[in-house]
């Protein structure tokens, strides 16, 4: 159980354990002859689907293109996500509403409300399992998106490099530089980010922040002796105090993860 969340230096404290990083670093341990791995990820560094607007949609569009999706398909996906969660039945230029979904072999209506889980994207026009979860050749969207509300934009102290690289004005070189420098010193203000990205800051500043997080996703995998294929569970928890937390998402099994030798 997480005892308390510490954002400084991207760390959290687990009960009975030392401080750990909350950037997806994989930790290992042993129970008798069996093994386990776990990692903790700060949700504030992901792109919040429920906070997506016509303006910030450019970030997911850039992310999709960077992941190998064709630009026209990315346009369809972004507009369709916005249509899926807005309250009306008017579709955007490349989007879809209930008239499209009701024409499918297994018809359903557009939700026209906030998303409850990232997996819900599989119901949105243009999204395929490969785009969402990735493949052996390509990364997917799943680990880069969230549905949990917060303020302050994408937290640049916690954002994966793929998310950083999708920000307007950000280049792969700048994303690598931000990712490297924040390991030694977290950014406390957007001016700190500006000292790294320079004149690109005004382009990305409407979409980012440095606010602390209280929501984390924990993925843990257990392995029997000499077996490489483990059993994985995943949970997203909101830390409400030093002794209280609330689970907002749980999945078991949560996909296969092979033990690294």
Task: State what each model feature region is.
Residues 1-261:
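Compositionally biased linear targeting/interaction segments
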């Amino acid at each position: 159980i997480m005892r308390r969340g510490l954002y400084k230096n991207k760390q959290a404290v687990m009960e009975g354990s030392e401080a750990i990083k909350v950037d997806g670093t994989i930790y290992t341990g042993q129970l008798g002859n069996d093994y386990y791995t776990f990692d903790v990820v700060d949700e504030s560094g992901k792109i919040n689907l429920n906070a997506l607007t016509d303006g910030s949609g450019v970030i997911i569009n850039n992310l999709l293109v960077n992941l190998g999706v064709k630009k026209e398909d990315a346009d369809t996906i972004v507009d369709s996500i916005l249509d899926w969660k807005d309250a009306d039945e008017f579709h955007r230029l490349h989007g879809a509403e209930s008239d499209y979904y009701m024409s499918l072999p297994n018809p359903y209506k557009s939700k026209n409300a906030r998303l409850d889980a990232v997996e819900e994207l599989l119901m949105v026009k243009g999204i395929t399992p490969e785009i969402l979860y990735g493949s052996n050749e390509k990364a997917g969207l799943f680990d880069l998106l969230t549905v949990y509300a917060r303020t302050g934009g994408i937290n640049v102290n916690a954002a994966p490099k793929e998310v950083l690289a999708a920000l307007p004005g950000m280049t792969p070189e700048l994303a690598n530089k931000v990712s490297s420098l924040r390991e030694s010193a977290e950014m406390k203000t957007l001016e700190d980010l500006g000292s790294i990205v320079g004149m690109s800051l005004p382009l990305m500043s409407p979409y980012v922040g440095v606010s602390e997080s209280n929501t984390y996703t924990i993925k843990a995998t257990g392995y029997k002796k000499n077996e490489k294929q483990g059993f994985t569970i995943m949970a997203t928890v909101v830390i409400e105090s030093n002794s209280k937390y609330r689970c907002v998402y749980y999945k078991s099994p949560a996909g296969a993860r092979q033990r690294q030798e």
